[in-house]
Amino acid sequence: MINKIMKKYETIYALATAPYNSAIHVIRLSGPDAFEIINKICDKQITKEGYRIQNARIVDNDQIIDDVLLMKFVAPKSFTGEDSIEINCHGGLFVINKIMALLNKHGAHLARRGEFSKRSYINKKIDLNQATAIHDLIFAKNNLSHSASIKALSGEFSKDIKNIQQEIFRLIGLVEIAIDYPEYEDEKKELTEEFKNLTNIRQKLQRIVNKSLKLKQISEGIKIAIVGEPNAGKSSLLNALLNEQKAIVTNIPGTTRDTVEGQIVLNDELIINLIDTAGIRKSSDQIEQIGINKSFKTIDKSDLVIYLIDLNKYQNYDKTNIYKYLINKKKQFVLVGNKVDEVDPTLNTGEIQIKISAKNNDISDLIKYLEETSLAIFNDENKQDSIFQEEWQINLLQTALYNINLILNDPNQYHDLVIQHLNEANNSLLKVLSEYEDYNLIDEIFKNFCLGK
């Protein structure tokens, strides 16, 4: 039960900054004995005045450990809702270890991962979505993720879900009336009208789930495979995009026998996972064929495919192999002609969408295309919709959506079944809102947080 409400009356401490030598470190101390413990290790009386900064020396008997600044927060006006002190000390690891050893000696316990945020949740300073937003904000990799984290932290997304949950809860009441008083025709008519609103709820939830899945996809990185026949310049293109010598480049066909991966960030926002694949051709070489099979599997898992063609061989490139596979699989792909510097500018290259020279780093048109196409994956319609980034949130929203679909796909089912589906949807949304406590879920969420957070 939330780690037995986290041994509620323990006073905890942890380093809130990264554990490296630096100019300044911050050690957090929180709990009912925070001021009593800090007074045991300081050279002067630390008064219980909130929102004040006080200078003091940390001492061990008569030995001065450090000269520090103490930021004081008195319950309930603190992040955790408890008495809290943030010790701003000098940034040597020896110093922070000495201070934390003193805190431990005088009764404070080293905090578990996410324990400060968990106490904030238990003391109703934040809800689960806001707690998760703190974690997402720390690990945000792009503007989209950062913006979603800030909005979630403000409680904006929780309000959206609360509105949907209240609509479903109201429907539960109407269905229960219809079950208890089947003779009232007016109630039946009202219920029929209200079920039309359920369609709007489904559409709203579907948009939220779709946008959340897309943001998760973008945050993890859009997968782009570079495919083509041997010696088309795939490895040279990967190296040019990464601006480093990641893949081996030779004139010998079939040099790349396994996938080679690298990551770039476009516009400080779009994470692109690039995958260079083995050249695809008919081959009797058993080892090369393994690489070719892997290339096709990489295509299957990719969000976008760069089909690279050597412009020297454009007139004879084989449409029956790679091209046909991409069409059959309905993959989004772009035809890119490489080695533009080696061919006659008047060469008819009708199907080629972009021309580059990977060897000469002339790839600006391709980069522009990748930026535009990757952004298009995240459709920015309905910007006001909430976006959730964690798997547990998305899973619960999908469960609610699934149960709403069960009702709308069979509008003539018994009211008892309708009630069951509505309750499942309602409970899922209550879990998102942290109003229906699933203690195992709560422990799992905070377990993934940083120490000191």
From Swiss-Prot:
One of its GO terms (cellular component) is cytosol. Its EC number is 3.6.-.-. Its cofactor is K(+). GO terms for molecular function: GTP binding; GTPase activity; metal ion binding. (6S)-5-formyl-5,6,7,8-tetrahydrofolate binds at R28, E86, K125, K453. Mg(2+) binds at S235, T256. K(+) binds at N231, T250, I252, T255. GTP binds at residues 231-236, 250-256, 276-279. Binds 1 potassium ion per subunit. Keywords: Cytoplasm, GTP-binding, Hydrolase, Magnesium, Metal-binding, Nucleotide-binding, Potassium, tRNA processing. It is found in: Cytoplasm. NCBIfam families: mnmE_trmE_thdF, small_GTP. Homodimer. Heterotetramer of two MnmE and two MnmG subunits. Belongs to the TRAFAC class TrmE-Era-EngA-EngB-Septin-like GTPase superfamily. TrmE GTPase family. This is tRNA modification GTPase MnmE. It comes from Mycoplasmoides gallisepticum (strain R(low / passage 15 / clone 2)) (Mycoplasma gallisepticum). The gene is mnmE.
